[in-house]
């Protein structure tokens, strides 16, 4: 049995023939043109066709993956509509008398080089990748070349690619695409996250799969352990068929837990919740037996609108989610705009590092007219369910007090106007900045609850962009530095009689879950498709056995891998 090893990105086992997702030849020759107007018209047609493509892909992505994953295509369309980008291309055509292909390449190369040179700026690195993806699409229309369309796959296959762009992944049809394997990527890359949303096995970061496999080769993909079996024998296929059936049986057992509580062997109860981006995601939450919504990302209300959403529009969205959850808690995060989330109708200053700049609560406190509108809508909606409000990107106690003060002010105004507001309204904050994790004991006196955002907390603590492959090895959720911060937050909240949740990727991670249960995390919020798996895992745990495990994990010698093995060994007999 010959195996190729990679990073297990999405659980499951699949056997099928390889489908090579090969990028077409987009080479061209530089040429001098005499009719600039005609060439600019060619460019405009290619831009329009590309925008049309992206609108279609975005719709497919929203239906199959949800609004959060579809949002990346909004960024792509914004590039195509950016006058600085398109104007520079037109300028090249007019001034240098070059064909549209050459003008596009020169301008795109300049933008990409500028962004990629900012190695400490995650936002700019992501924009560079977006420009490459968009440029490829526009160039294909200029050349009359068809890009690969995974949506046209009509037989059972395993997709093999050097990498999968968000556009590629969004078009994968789970009926026929049984799995995918790539040369590059990590567990937190766009393609990996989308694979988990689609519930298809995936392995990334193999480095050589496109060299080791050719179209039509029979493969087995083990997305649980990160193995690709090349040229499997009948015995190999039979062995993995048994494993696949065992996994299917396991999922069927998970289904039985839909209406059960999340309880450990020794009777400790936890809340397993789901994250959503829009009211459309509510169906998945209910289908998977979530006990709450631990994170409602309200920024998509703003991103899916051509203008600032009105108070009434927001009220209706919040009300529909609260009513849909039928009394189960809903934690709503106030607007988290900035960083990688920009609004065409709300210009933000250009910054060297937007992720550490004017974003989230910093915008809300500065533009309290926008903030107050959202808070009024939330307060009005509080009558229709169990609402929890939390503020993102809080760094100081003063920020939290200011935000809560504005909330209390709007609440008083509504009551004075004769409107009712729920008297069971908790107000908390995201813990995603190391400063707030370190000083959790001070914040715990002010808040009703904490919600730990591990995606940003890990990046800021380790000074490593999780989307940058050069430093992604430092994105270490099991690093003892991260574990100590998390434990500090949980302990601080409990000391004050408050509760702590987690809404980052780590909450649904099979290695992190036993550690988090041992630390006493109260609420685990994750992708809806992970809820039953985590609930099942909890039933195998005895909290009395976890104290020593946690103590060892927070004191290892800065080794992410050591803690991973520690938990894996611990779970073998459970």
Curated annotation (Swiss-Prot):
Keyword DNA damage recorded: no
Residues bound to Mg(2+): 432, 456
Keyword Ribosomal protein on entry: no
Entry cofactors: Mg(2+)
Keywords: Cytoplasm, Kinase, Magnesium, Metal-binding, Phosphotransferase system, Sugar transport, Transferase, Transport
Gene3D superfamilies membership: Phosphoenolpyruvate-binding domains, Phosphohistidine domain, PtsI, HPr-binding domain
One GO molecular-function entry: metal ion binding
A Pfam match: PEP-utilizers
Catalytic function, reaction form: L-histidyl-[protein] + phosphoenolpyruvate = N(pros)-phospho-L-histidyl-[protein] + pyruvate
Protein's cellular compartments: Cytoplasm
InterPro entries: PEP-util_enz_mobile_dom, PEP-utilizing_PTS_enzyme, PEP_util_AS, PEP_util_C, PEP_util_CS, Phosphohistidine_dom_sf, PTS_EI, PTS_EI-like
GO cellular component, one term: cytoplasm
GO biological process, one term: phosphoenolpyruvate-dependent sugar phosphotransferase system
Chief place where the protein resides: cytoplasm
Annotated active site: 190 (tele-phosphohistidine intermediate), 503 (proton donor)
EC primary class: transferase
Domain of life: Bacteria
Subunit annotation: Homodimer.
Family: Belongs to the PEP-utilizing enzyme family.
UniProt comment concerning the protein's domains: The N-terminal domain contains the HPr binding site, the central domain the pyrophosphate/phosphate carrier histidine, and the C-terminal domain the pyruvate binding site.
The protein's role, per its UniProt record: General (non sugar-specific) component of the phosphoenolpyruvate-dependent sugar phosphotransferase system (sugar PTS). This major carbohydrate active-transport system catalyzes the phosphorylation of incoming sugar substrates concomitantly with their translocation across the cell membrane. Enzyme I transfers the phosphoryl group from phosphoenolpyruvate (PEP) to the phosphoryl carrier protein (HPr).
Descriptive protein name: Phosphoenolpyruvate-protein phosphotransferase
Organism encoding this protein: Latilactobacillus sakei
